[in-house]
Amino acid sequence: MGDMANNSVAYSGVKNSLKEANHDGDFGITLAELRALMELRSTDALRKIQESYGDVYGICTKLKTSPNEGLSGNPADLERREAVFGKNFIPPKKPKTFLQLVWEALQDVTLIILEIAAIVSLGLSFYQPPEGDNALCGEVSVGEEEGEGETGWIEGAAILLSVVCVVLVTAFNDWSKEKQFRGLQSRIEQEQKFTVIRGGQVIQIPVADITVGDIAQVKYGDLLPADGILIQGNDLKIDESSLTGESDHVKKSLDKDPLLLSGTHVMEGSGRMVVTAVGVNSQTGIIFTLLGAGGEEEEKKDEKKKEKKNKKQDGAIENRNKAKAQDGAAMEMQPLKSEEGGDGDEKDKKKANLPKKEKSVLQGKLTKLAVQIGKAGLLMSAITVIILVLYFVIDTFWVQKRPWLAECTPIYIQYFVKFFIIGVTVLVVAVPEGLPLAVTISLAYSVKKMMKDNNLVRHLDACETMGNATAICSDKTGTLTMNRMTVVQAYINEKHYKKVPEPEAIPPNILSYLVTGISVNCAYTSKILPPEKEGGLPRHVGNKTECALLGLLLDLKRDYQDVRNEIPEEALYKVYTFNSVRKSMSTVLKNSDGSYRIFSKGASEIILKKCFKILSANGEAKVFRPRDRDDIVKTVIEPMASEGLRTICLAFRDFPAGEPEPEWDNENDIVTGLTCIAVVGIEDPVRPEVPDAIKKCQRAGITVRMVTGDNINTARAIATKCGILHPGEDFLCLEGKDFNRRIRNEKGEIEQERIDKIWPKLRVLARSSPTDKHTLVKGIIDSTVSDQRQVVAVTGDGTNDGPALKKADVGFAMGIAGTDVAKEASDIILTDDNFTSIVKAVMWGRNVYDSISKFLQFQLTVNVVAVIVAFTGACITQDSPLKAVQMLWVNLIMDTLASLALATEPPTESLLLRKPYGRNKPLISRTMMKNILGHAFYQLVVVFTLLFAGEKFFDIDSGRNAPLHAPPSEHYTIVFNTFVLMQLFNEINARKIHGERNVFEGIFNNAIFCTIVLGTFVVQIIIVQFGGKPFSCSELSIEQWLWSIFLGMGTLLWGQLISTIPTSRLKFLKEAGHGTQKEEIPEEELAEDVEEIDHAERELRRGQILWFRGLNRIQTQIRVVNAFRSSLYEGLEKPESRSSIHNFMTHPEFRIEDSEPHIPLIDDTDAEDDAPTKRNSSPPPSPNKNNNAVDSGIHLTIEMNKSATSSSPGSPLHSLETSL
């Protein structure tokens, strides 16, 4: 494409480029050129920009965008950009087709056994012994009616058909589950928005809509959604470890390193960038595409080599625990592993298998329970088969003394196959394969409904873990309060105003300082916009504390925008942006006479300590002594704080023109010797619904703690208003430094015993840093002082809250105020930032737990009865009263349909009236065990009575001891029908697990339950009346049906009888399904601690491997690719899909073990040459400390003595050489 304009185009030409975009068909820069530019680093990138485009404005010109106005937003222009440069979207891995899911469902071992047995049965049923030989085969073949022999194949075919039904139902469930997860994934993507400038307006658009040429505003906490080049930056620091492996934050500036890469985190500062690459063309996209494509191409080869590899290298591939990757929203790649085996292998294995968090409580309990039930079922089915075979052999060859005739062999084998099928059906019924389905359905249903309750669940298991929560550590601002801040009090010109004063009451020079200081020393992204509806409140955009200060100016009848127009963001000389360590923000202005003025704002106690002067009543600065400061603290700040106000101090300092220029990087020397302008009290009202929500939590046995950065008096006042603290209670309120002093020993190390003395009584942690929050959360989780280990939920919104959110059992991020980094580290996103939504999450979590318990109570009752009936019946009557096909139908009711019916019960407020279950609470309580055994007893009595006396009662032929291929009997049909109807009515009983009397309460609120129960009943009628030979059923009369229904309904009456027996009397009942025992935990926790300690080190290596793999295909020779592949690609499994760039960096990608594999360097000679060179080959610093493009004095003087192929210091290739 031809250049649209010369590189030295005047700045005015940039503004006109928007108009040109409408009629000029081509851009002045190609996709390939942009990709090549974004692959360069630091000095190489600067050289390329200077040589080819002049500066970043030259790139804006070629992309036909304005650095100040952005794109016009014209749909035709946006479409053309997407067509040329691509869409900001990485295509997800194709979902599994329905046929693939069917194939996966067919892999079930019990179903395979059943299929084989059915095929054998089918084949043998066509064999008939020669005429006249029937008598020789003994009684086994007697009793067949004429024509019945020909229908012997039906049972085998019916079993196959039933297996097909089960497989189709399973596949359909998996398909709908996957569809739902993809829906959740797209919902998460839609939630991700980014701030851009279009048509001169600052707007937020979905990440997928960002296109090349957009001017994006980046700020602290953002996860960059695309590649770009910096136009203007304020103290911008980026965490690039996810891509380059460098664990140190990288300072971005126009004169050193202006390239911003997708998938990296903004850790400090703010700025604007022009987007240069999106989607698969961004750096994240390129690597993702290469890994994905490479994996698919090599997948087949890998599979062929797998066996050989496993033999050659022990444990080459480590399967990582994916507790957090079930939902498809946060898939993880398989870790790499060293080829070196040896003694360290076991340690390596443990380390590689470190989960993000320990396995979810419910999963652990269910797995344990399922294994126990499975073992019992296998034992029962084996005993059943052995008894049947022995009974048959002894009766035929011992009692009847028959010889084994060759022509009778197929008949005998048919019997053995029949016995085998009975054994397998016992196993099928006994093994609770419906458990995982019930969990999935319950979680998926809950997740869908929780979205309506403003909980966007990113990790499925967080949903059920929330039901066990015993403690919530909540932020204050925005979660407990409304996050709509207003200045309500002020201390200006030595007067304490209880409401905002009139502008006339303030001396003009103080007012001037106040207006300028607030206007320029608040982020320019913070602003107050007119209300959306007439009569509504003005909209606060950006940081809410800054909006309160801007609101103060409006109350003083001054317009901050006039000041900002006069001093645009580009003109700010230096900005010390706010972070959790500074707790302040400062901005330096350069005056026309060469002097400087710095404005500071921040926590009052921090800024006041740096003030040596204060503006007096007449507007003059006077000395501010320590005792004056103490007076202000006592008479102004403490009274404000006790009313729950946040106090902010505003100050300034002048640097005269004649003095040498200060050392701007030495912040401590700059932000000191200040003159105090004012102290303001900002009110952030408690959300009206919060006190009630906290009361519910306390009633539900959940302790709520407030962790805030505000001072202790403000925090205490708000905690009292919320109901976290009550007057007269003996609870602790600590400041961060006091908390640290109490929990650390003389060496400064944290001791768990010290934390254990504090946390049970701690309710408020004020002036705390994110590190304090992490320490508290970890201390509570690791504590063993209480009987139950604590399950902790945490809320967070800042970038530095990531560690605490990850450490917590459930991390809640704020959907509105939260940074992208916090959202990526969280399990659930609160879309309304409201504490009451957390209470709803607790309800849903407990509901999931109860739903699983309801299903277990129902299923185990069926299991016990079906297994005992099949076993006893088979041993006594030499045949199972419930046939294989009938068992499969029961299994279908029991597993799939019941799990759907019971797992979709909506939650009720009553769930919050009991204490949390905790980690070690068994899944099956003694009340549930009483219900299971009580109902099993009733059902067994009914079934055995019908089995051994039913024919007399109903005056029909007995179905016992029927010969092979005998027609279905009414007797056994009644047994089957009654058995199914008892399960159906017991499903209603199973809705209550805490001994409640009214089992029908709320039944009509669950349409799915009612539909399934009625649907099952209708299908049962069809099976019995029209099922015939395939279902081994004979038509029943109305009288027989009424008796079956009556006996089925008896379970409801029997349930009432069971409820009257107090559980406390039944001491002999055991609980089942316990969680992880206490002594099993420390190892996991220890491993997790090791993970945290080694995080930075592993982060470094992980990032390098990731970059190395992406770059080696693009930038280096084929021999290096081959060498690299031979050493590293072995043992790498194909990464699973991610659907968008934004989610690509969700989790750490690779784990490299301590014993590092040998990785060939890109060029060993270069590495040696580079070693002695100094790393300061960057250009001399610009006199403009803010690194803005407006400053024409930027010198892009770069050393040109390096060859293009060698890696310059600071580049990713160089860091690879030096580190790897």
From Swiss-Prot:
Sections of the chain in a coiled coil: none
Annotated localization: Cell membrane; Basolateral cell membrane; Synapse; Presynaptic cell membrane
GO BP, sorted A to Z: calcium ion export across plasma membrane; monoatomic ion transmembrane transport; negative regulation of cytokine production; negative regulation of cytosolic calcium ion concentration; positive regulation of bone mineralization; positive regulation of calcium ion transport; regulation of blood pressure; regulation of cardiac conduction
Keywords attached to this entry: Acetylation, ATP-binding, Calcium, Calcium transport, Calmodulin-binding, Cell membrane, Cell projection, Cytoplasmic vesicle, Disease variant, Intellectual disability, Ion transport, Magnesium, Membrane, Metal-binding, Nucleotide-binding, Phosphoprotein, Synapse, Translocase, Transmembrane, Transmembrane helix, Transport
Topology feature Extracellular, residues: 127-154, 387-418, 877-882, 949-971, 1028-1039
Phosphothreonine: residues carrying this PTM: 1116, 1165
CDD domains according to UniProt: P-type_ATPase_Ca_PMCA-like (cd02081)
Outcome following mutation: residue 598 to T: Found in a patient with developmental delay; uncertain significance; no effect on calcium ion export across plasma membrane
Topology Cytoplasmic: residue spans: 2-105, 176-366, 440-855, 904-927, 992-1005, 1061-1220
Gene3D superfamilies reported in the protein's UniProt record: Calcium-transporting ATPase, cytoplasmic domain N, Calcium-transporting ATPase, cytoplasmic transduction domain A, Calcium-transporting ATPase, transmembrane domain, HAD superfamily/HAD-like
Enzyme class name: translocase
UniProt entry tagged with the keyword Transmembrane: yes
Upregulating conditions: Up-regulated at the proliferative phase of the mentrual cycle. Up-regulated by estrogen.
Active site: 475
Mutagenesis or variant effect for residue 789 to C: In MRD66; decreased calcium ion export across plasma membrane
Result, substituting residue 425 to K: In MRD66; decreased calcium ion export across plasma membrane
Compositionally biased tracts (Polar residues): 1200-1220
SMART domains: Cation_ATPase_N (SM00831)
Pfam assignment, any one: ATP_Ca_trans_C
Modified residues (Phosphoserine): 8, 17, 338, 1140, 1155, 1178, 1182
Family: Belongs to the cation transport ATPase (P-type) (TC 3.A.3) family. Type IIB subfamily.
Record note on quaternary structure: Monomer. Dimer. Oligomer. Calmodulin binding. Interacts with PDZD11. Interacts with SLC35G1 and STIM1; inhibits calcium-transporting ATPase activity after store depletion. Interacts with YWHAE; interacts with the monomeric and dimeric forms of the YWHAE but prefer the monomer form; this interaction inhibits calcium-transporting ATPase activity. Interacts with NPTN; this interaction stabilizes ATP2B1 and increases ATPase activity; this interaction controls T cell calcium homeostasis following T cell activation.
Known function: Catalyzes the hydrolysis of ATP coupled with the transport of calcium from the cytoplasm to the extracellular space thereby maintaining intracellular calcium homeostasis. Plays a role in blood pressure regulation through regulation of intracellular calcium concentration and nitric oxide production leading to regulation of vascular smooth muscle cells vasoconstriction. Positively regulates bone mineralization through absorption of calcium from the intestine.
Name of the featured protein: Plasma membrane calcium-transporting ATPase 1
Species whose genome carries this gene: Homo sapiens
